[in-house]
UniProtKB/Swiss-Prot annotation:
This is Protein RecA. ATP binds at G66, P67, E68, S69, S70, G71, K72, T73. It holds the Pfam family RecA. The gene is recA. Keywords: ATP-binding, Cytoplasm, DNA damage, DNA recombination, DNA repair, DNA-binding, Nucleotide-binding, SOS response. Its main location: cytoplasm.
Amino acid sequence: MDEQRSKGLSAALSQIDKQFGKGAVMRLGDHNAIKDIEVYSTGSLGLDLALGVGGLPRGRVVEIYGPESSGKTTLTLHAIASCQAAGGTAAFIDAEHALDPGYAHKLGVDLENLLISQPDTGEQALEIADMLVRSGAVDLIVIDSVAALTPKAEIEGEMGDSHVGLQARLMSQALRNLTANISRSNTLVIFINQIRMKIGVMYGSPETTTGGNALKFYASVRLDIRRIGAIKKSDEVVGNDTRVKVVKNKVAPPFREAEFAIYYGEGISRLSELVDLGVKFDIVEKSGAWYSYQGHRIGQGKDNARQYLKVHPELAANIEQRIRAAAAGHPLAFAEEVESPQRSAS
């Protein structure tokens, strides 16, 4: 690019940043994302790296959507545990009335200090969220889920009455008020959303999310989470392989992907990720079914390697440190799409 065009582009980018905020336009290969952003870990090392800033950014709206039982709530519970571990206060607005306290505790959530609300209507849920945000004392709020935010008029109406666009209007109005307060209070607000099918779509994906288009626009980060395979131990299914795609990201380049294992009753397996990412970055050697680190065998099969790292946390910490260093030098390492077949845990 010649000097005159380069100056013109720089001036345009500067004006865009001034008018729409820093990060409105970014170079896809730029791994030096916006600095000084406070984040909370997702519980997945690979996803934290794929997000470009090390986790879910504070002071932003995040949407996590996917099919049923794909790991949406698990991801948010890990984020809550991360927030509480850092000394923060978290709230869970359970519009679905389906939170499992026992499972949350297993994932590291401090139940005694977790604020929880089970609202009756969508208006009540979003008003509670707004009041918590405006208090400035809550660091993370999870709303589970957008589909369950039923407008008051629909609840009070007759079964079969038409309520076209009510929920979309509710979300649009609420987000207009929420976003400014979220930015001022530096609160991370996560909306969990479900997938619906559009009727009569001939070309392109028929999938859409509930609640209209407002959340798509206001969200700084949108994560598409999918179950891609079962993890088996002998003949028993003990968990799922999961893929998350960053479909929108206003704090770092988007379209990156991460894959990790979710074990039933345990949540995201960070140790399995260390094995997978270690192999990906040539930090852990794999020969046949055996995994080795610095010439020493750590297990035959991924599950045995995972158990070895569980017993040797200092080794796991060393591998994680090397993975982070390697990922910093490969900004597009998580941009690849890799088909992952069903695998066995042993």
